[in-house]
C-alpha cells in the first residue's frame, strides 16, 4: 500500500500526473510515502485514459501536476485524475498546481475576452477538487476564483535564502521589472536586509504593435549588484531587456530570480546571452540546466511536502511563510 495511515484511520495518498513525475517523487520522499500507482495512456485521437491501481475510498488525496508544455494536455489529465478520485469515493481531494495555468488571463482586457483563470478554477471544482494549492500566483485575486480553500504558497524564502548564502547583501538593490511588481519587490527588499529598491519603467513600442519596451530605470543602480525578480519568465524578452537597461544605468551585475521558469523559446538563448550573472528559478516546472551554464534550479518539493503535511494534519499552512499561527 502507498498510503500513509494514522490512528484515526485517515489515509494520505499522493498522486502524480505524467508532466513532472520527478517533482512528485521528491515530495513523496519528504513525506515518507509512495506515489500511488496509476495507469495513464493516450488514445490515438489524443484522448487520455487514467486509472488508479489501489482503492482510494475514504482517503485524503493530493494530486500533483505541473502545467508545462503541452499545457492543455496536462491540465486535462489532472481533471480526469480528480474526477476518478471523486467517483472512487475519496474523502477529500486537493489539487496541487505548483504553476497555475492561464494565470495571466485573470481579467478582461478588452471586450469579448474570456477570464481563463476563473474557468480553470471552475473546471477543478466541477471535476471534484475540494481544495487548491499553488505557488506564487500571478495575481492574488485568483484565490477568489475557487469556491473553497486556496493555499497560496510563496517561494520567496527559498530564493532569498539562496541569495543570502551566495551574494554580498551590502551592495544589493532589489529591482522590479515593472511598476506592478513593486509590492513584491518591497517584501524581497525587507527580507534581504532592507535593501534599496528600483524598478524598470516600461512603455509601449511606437514601432511594433502590442510590444512593451523597457526604457529606463527608476532608482539608483550605478555600481550595484541588482536582483531582478519576477513571478514567472516565459519567452524572456522583457527580463532580458530589463537586464540591458540596468547595465546601461551602470549596474555592476544583475541576477535574475523567478519562481516559475516557463522558458518558452527563445528564452534560453535570450537569458544566457543577456549579461545576467545568474538565472535562479525553482522546479515548479520541469527544468534542465544542460547547455545553460548560468541557470540554477532550486527544489520546491520541501515546501509542497510541508504544505501537504499541514493540510493532512489540520495544521496551519500560514506558519510556513509567516512564522506564527
From Swiss-Prot:
Subunit structure: Homohexamer.
Localisation per UniProt entry: Cytoplasm
Residues bound to Mg(2+) 1: 138
Gene name of this polypeptide: prs
Catalysed reaction, written as an equation: D-ribose 5-phosphate + ATP = 5-phospho-alpha-D-ribose 1-diphosphate + AMP + H(+)
Protein name from the UniProt record: Ribose-phosphate pyrophosphokinase
Pfam families membership: Pribosyl_synth, Pribosyltran_N
Keywords: ATP-binding, Cytoplasm, Kinase, Magnesium, Metal-binding, Nucleotide biosynthesis, Nucleotide-binding, Transferase
Recorded metabolic or biological pathway in which this protein acts: Metabolic intermediate biosynthesis; 5-phospho-alpha-D-ribose 1-diphosphate biosynthesis; 5-phospho-alpha-D-ribose 1-diphosphate from D-ribose 5-phosphate (route I): step 1/1
